[in-house]
């Protein structure tokens, strides 16, 4: 159905899919890896990129990324937007390189696992903590991919 809806997109329109497991007031609604939907979603959906949650164990491992077709990018949501504590940069970099076993590094990106305020209530982070998360993402991305 999604492919039918976006079939006539303009050439310069970039379409992405975000797989969200819930992001209400620093809580989540569902869990489970991407394996059950990987072949259909990553192999057949006609989008340009996927924004995927990988901020904790409830997202499963990176193996389903092997199903991502060669014309798509994957944005790894490795930095949580649910908790204020900053992740260890070395741990995040190691996870990026682990994901690169399935999707080439040049087709990977880094982001928070979701937005900071998917609903009016937002998550339990101050504005300062949110900016610190964004700075962390930027710093790690510069180390891994350069400019």
Language-model region placement:
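Domain-level signal for soluble alpha/beta catalytic cores
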Residues: 1-147
């Amino acid at each position: 159905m999604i492919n039918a809806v976006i079939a006539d997109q303009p050439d310069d329109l970039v379409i992405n899919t975000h797989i969200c497991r819930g992001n209400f007031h620093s809580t989540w609604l569902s869990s489970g890896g991407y394996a059950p939907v990987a072949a259909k979603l990553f192999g057949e959906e006609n989008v340009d990129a996927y924004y995927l949650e990988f901020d904790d164990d409830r997202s499963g491992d990176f193996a389903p990324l092997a199903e991502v077709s060669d014309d798509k990018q994957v944005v790894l949501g490795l930095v949580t937007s649910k908790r204020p504590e900053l992740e260890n940069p070395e741990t995040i970099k190691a996870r990026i390189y682990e994901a690169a076993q399935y999707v080439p590094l040049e087709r990977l990106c880094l982001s928070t696992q979701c937005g900071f305020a998917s609903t009016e209530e937002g998550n339990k982070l101050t504005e300062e903590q949110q900016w610190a998360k964004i700075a962390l993402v930027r710093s790690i991305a510069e180390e891994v991919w350069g400019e």
